[in-house]
Design a protein with these regions (language model features):
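Juxtadomain low-complexity/linker regions and immediately adjacent membrane-anchoring helices
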Residues: 198-218, 324-397, 432-448
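Short, conserved beta-strand segments of beta-strand-rich sandwich/propeller modules, principally
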Residues: 307-309, 425
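Trp- and acidic/polar-enriched beta-sheet ligand-binding modules for extracellular glycan
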Residues: 277-304, 313-316, 406-410, 432-450
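Flavin (FAD/FMN)-binding glycine-rich loop and adjacent Rossmann-like elements that form
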Residues: 1-246, 257-290, 299, 312-349
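Aromatic, loop-rich ligand-recognition surfaces of beta-strand-rich domains
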Residues: 238, 244, 248-274, 327-329, ...
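Long, low-complexity, Ser/Pro/Thr- and acidic-rich intrinsically disordered regulatory regions
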Residues: 250, 309-310
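A broad, low-specificity signal marking well-ordered, structured residues that form hydrophobic/aromatic
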Residues: 46, 130-131, 308, 413-415, ...
Length: 450
């Protein structure tokens, strides 16, 4: 249990044994209460099979690099010229006194989106040949609360492995590789391998080609073929728009046994690279009674590529029709909370913490994810053949992928060049289902093969 902590005010390296004995007291004291208090009758036949011998160190020594990842890098989502990885976990801080503290076991502060991690934080300032990853990187105590998690550590491991290979091949130091003229080769190596670096593009060697495709899907309507769902919580339909594109009117099948008022808002993100719905663009209300199709119209034209939220307020007396159709880059999110890591559906800055206030919009994991049925008065061109060459491998600000028409029996792509090209290999990137909300396979997967 992560909250069985103690030792934050001690030297976790040289006083590890002292910490171990106190943690054992805590573990067996908790177990004694579970077994003998009478509050947990289901525990009568349970036993503890094993308790660790070595304390797990949440935080210990860190090295100092040529830069220090800090809170502002995370909250302000600062871009670094040498960005090589990303993080997304909250700044997750635990009280130094552990279980004996009067404070909650943890306090989490979220940024509005992913942040980048600079390569200069991944090597030692004082040792020419030492690369750092995991929980050793150059970061402040506060920033460490986010960058320490295992998925981020794994991403950094890939970066450091690639960097070590380049340093060895070119006989240079990590600090030399971090120079602006050199670090781009590391970034491009990572992107070619499928790594994600926010707001970085892969320089595509086939970008000089002309692309012809058999067809391209345009979003006009999603059929109502999956039943009805009451609006049990505030939710939103995510739709991307291209710069200069107007949001067409949208109609949805709704029903209510008695007359109800439904409040609908149009939201977007101040930072177009985010999907946090922190900026209100427009709102309107509609009167719902019986079962019919209702029309929503917002006069909005996008100033840049960005995602929009068409948000529906909670009203369990109103039901909306669902669709079985799933399309890349179009999905539902919910203004809800994950009770494991949050107590509210909105981040509240109730002190001088230097963080933002905003609503949490969460997708649901398969098979619990849903999508509203709807129709657009004018089709949206969400998937483009140009995206096959734009060097963006994730749905950042737009879908960044091509989708053929649903009735295209033999979808195909043709690349043409004015001159003969020589190629050693071709890499095809298929849909990796980035809309699927799965932090790690440990969460389980409803579509697992085995």
């Amino acid at each position: 249990l992560w909250w069985l902590e103690w030792g934050g005010r001690l030297d976790t390296v040289h006083e590890s044994e002292t910490i171990k004995w106190e943690l054992w007291k805590i573990v067996w004291g908790v177990w004694d209460y579970i077994k003998n208090s009478g509050e947990f009758p289901d525990a009568d036949t349970l036993t503890i099979e094993w308790v660790g011998l070595i304390p797990g160190k949440r935080e210990s020594r860190r090295f100092l690099g040529d830069t220090l990842l800090c809170q502002q890098d995370i909250i302000e989502q600062r871009d670094h010229y040498d960005a090589v990885a990303y993080g997304g976990w909250s700044i997750d801080l635990h009280p130094a006194d552990g279980v004996y503290s009067e404070h909650d076991g943890c306090r989490q502060f979220h940024s509005k989106g992913t942040y980048t991690i600079p390569f200069r934080a991944l090597y030692s300032q004082s040792l020419d040949n030492l690369l750092l990853t995991g929980r050793l990187i150059s970061a402040t105590h506060v920033a460490f609360g986010s960058a320490r998690v295992m998925c981020t550590c794994g991403v950094l491991g890939e970066v450091v492995g690639r960097a070590a290979a380049i340093c060895h091949q070119q006989q240079i130091t990590p600090a030399q590789l971090a120079q602006p003229a050199r670090v781009t080769q590391l970034q491009q190596h990572l992107l070619r391998a499928g790594a994600y670096i926010p707001r970085q593009r892969l320089v595509n060697p086939v970008s000089t080609a002309r692309v012809a495709v058999s067809s391209t899907l345009q979003l006009r309507a999603l059929p109502a073929d999956a039943g009805w769902q009451p609006l049990q919580s505030r939710c939103a339909l995510l739709l991307p728009l291209k710069a200069g594109e107007r949001l067409p009117a949208i109609s949805l099948p709704l029903r209510a046994a008695q007359a109800q008022t439904l409040q609908v808002t149009l939201l977007t993100s101040d930072n177009p690279a985010n999907t946090c719905g922190d900026s209100l663009l427009a709102s309107q209300s509609i009167r719902v009674q019986g079962e019919e199709r209702y029309r929503l119209s917002f006069e909005y034209r996008a100033d840049c590529d960005r995602y929009l939220f068409i948000a529906f307020e909670e009203n369990p007396a109103i039901e909306v029709a669902l669709t079985q159709q799933r399309l890349p880059g179009v999905m539902m999110v919910f203004n809800s909370l994950n009770p494991r890591v949050a107590k509210r559906t909105r981040q509240i800055n109730d002190g001088d913490y230097g963080v933002d206030e905003f609503d949490f919009w969460l997708p649901r994991r398969v098979p619990h994810q849903i999508l509203f049925a709807f129709a657009l008065e004018a089709p949206l061109k969400l998937w483009h053949s140009d995206y096959l060459l734009n060097g963006k491998l994730r749905p950042e600000q737009h879908t960044n992928c091509w989708v053929p028409a649903l009735d295209d029996a033999q979808p195909h792509v043709v690349w043409r060049w004015d001159e003969t090209q020589q190629a050693r290999h071709i890499t095809l990137l298929l849909d990796n289902d980035f809309d699927h909300a799965m932090e790690t396979v440990q969460m389980g997967h409803a579509q697992a093969v085995t």
